[in-house]
């Protein structure tokens, strides 16, 4: 998983990171 940055809503980063941290998710 990425430690941040722009994520797609279908990206594993968004599912695992952005949904939890509410960080930069496009």
UniProtKB/Swiss-Prot annotation:
Keywords: Disulfide bond, Knottin, Secreted, Toxin. GO terms for molecular function: toxin activity. Disulfide bonds join 7-18, 13-25. It comes from the Eukaryota. Its main location: secreted. Expressed by the venom duct. It is found in: Secreted. The keyword NAD does not apply. The keyword Repeat does not apply. Belongs to the conotoxin O1 superfamily. The presence of a 'disulfide through disulfide knot' structurally defines this protein as a knottin. The cysteine framework is VI/VII (C-C-CC-C-C). This is Conotoxin Eb6.18.
